[in-house]
Regions:
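AAA+ P-loop NTPase catalytic core and its hallmark functional loops
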Residues: 7-194
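Single conserved hydrophobic/aromatic residue that forms the stacking wall/gate
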Residues: 1-6, 196-204
Length: 204
């Protein structure tokens, strides 16, 4: 699938579009669930591009650790001397900036890591950075989205080995859960015809 930023052909599902726009407009946490290759992450990116909203995607695979999200102590040079300084991870940085953070493969994250993002699932939830004894307040334009193949109950189809069951207390914190699956034949023809105007818009 090839989509340019701002491409009309990538925004073809009305319900998903409304759900994502609600997330941006009303600061709601939106989880987009669906089969692989349906354009879940791309859909969010395309809408963010139209709104001129910076968008960051993080693949939440099993190798992502708490340190990757929160941050860690790093050795730096300051005035010609080596010092140890805490370097914030992607999560504290995103919270403090007007960006849309997208967690890809949300249901593949390690259970112990998932609880790190529990607090920021609240639209006004502050984030306590214990390593710096600091409470981080969310930027009013910070937005949080996620994509997953399952709805948090594990893989019952056999298609998505490696996905996890998600704590239902955390699932309840998502304000909107929408589904984006494969397009119907008519919709696919309409999408292809949009970029190839000589093709018919419906199958015969």
């Amino acid at each position: 699938r090839s989509c340019l930023v701002g491409s009309e052909m990538c925004i073809r599902d009305r319900d998903t579009t409304i759900a994502i726009l609600s997330g941006f407009s009303f600061n709601k946490r939106v989880l987009v669930q669906g089969y692989h290759g349906t354009g879940k992450s791309t859909h969010i990116e395309q809408i963010a591009a139209r709104l001129n909203w910076p968008c960051i995607r993080v693949n939440l695979d099993s190798h992502i650790s708490r340190i990757d999200l929160i941050g860690k102590d790093a050795i730096k040079l300051k005035d010609g001397k080596q010092i140890t300084e805490f370097q914030e991870g992607i999560l504290p940085w995103s919270i403090q900036n007007p960006v849309a953070l997208v967690f890809d493969e949300y249901d593949a994250g390690r259970p112990d890591v998932m609880f790190v993002i529990q607090r920021i699932l609240e639209s006004e939830g502050n984030f306590t950075l214990l390593d710096k004894n600091k409470v981080i307040k969310q930027n009013k334009y910070f937005r949080l989205f996620a994509t997953s193949n399952t709805v948090g109950l594990g893989d019952t189809s056999g298609l998505y080995h490696g996905t996890q069951q998600i704590n239902q207390g955390q699932m309840d914190r998502w304000n909107i859960v929408t589904t984006l699956n494969y397009l119907s034949l008519e919709k696919e023809m309409e999408t292809v015809s949009y970029t190839h105007l000589t093709l018919p818009t419906s199958p015969k």
